[in-house]
Amino acid sequence: MPKPSLIALFAAFATAAAAQAPPAAQVPPAAQAPPTPEAAAPPVIPDEAWKPVDPANTLVVDTTKGRFVVEMHPELAPRHVARIKALARQGYYNGSLFYRVLDFMAQTGDKGNKQYRSSLPNMKNEATFRLTPAIPYLSIGALPTGDAGFIGAMPVLIQPAQGGPASGQPADQAPTSGEGSALFCPGTAAFAHGPSIDSANSQIFFMRVRGPNLEKQFTAWGRVIQGQDVVKALKNGEPPPSPDKMTRVRVMADMPAADRPRLKVLDVKSPAFAALLQQEIAAKGARFSICDVEIPVQAG
């Protein structure tokens, strides 16, 4: 099927990249927003377009505000995903406070809420990754800054190794190799670090709004696929007067089968997702951004 126009997508990305300001400051006043067109009926999603989440790469986070679920991406950041799994299996994150909650992100991950790191060694930064043909990448289209698309639920930007915008590759030819980086959209999960980019250890944060100024600076390891409303509901503060906390953090594969959330995610390679994407682009017009796209999840 023909690819949707990326003119609007590029405009949104160019504006965000040029601003380089905290995400909360980028939201225009409601009075300046253009009128929203009437929403079209969502396309019917056939059963075969849904796929079960991978229990080995799904993190279930219970908090004082409720539960959210994160799709982890070892193909983007293998060391950081391995660290999350190891600390979750140790019970390290259980009881960790959301001690720094700002408009754009919620930070947690300090077991003692005072030591700022686990006993494990710091990790080298994995803010960029190598796209290979083995990684199932869905291209939305070429931008002057790279090729935008999805790896599962994770929005990414690819600098093609060959072809692509820099060398005149047509927009409908998706790259299969090159350097990639995660886009810090709402729901992106990443590791915090100190002055050195190679000092990530146990501190993690979850994006509440878009944060382009964080891209390629911090290692993203996953994206919230269910429960982003929980992340948004966490009490603000640095620290909050009465912080929320993670009560229990588990890799889904480690949970008893009866206790696991029964979730299916829409396959981004499916025609159903392509139809949803085109509908979103048509509805938003020049205001469209890849961060507007929420990957549908089916429970039960």
Ranges and model annotations:
Residues M1-P4:
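Positively charged n-region of N-terminal signal peptides that target proteins for export
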Residues I7-A16:
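Bacterial N-terminal signal peptides
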Residues Q20-G300:
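Cyclophilin-like peptidyl-prolyl cis-trans isomerases
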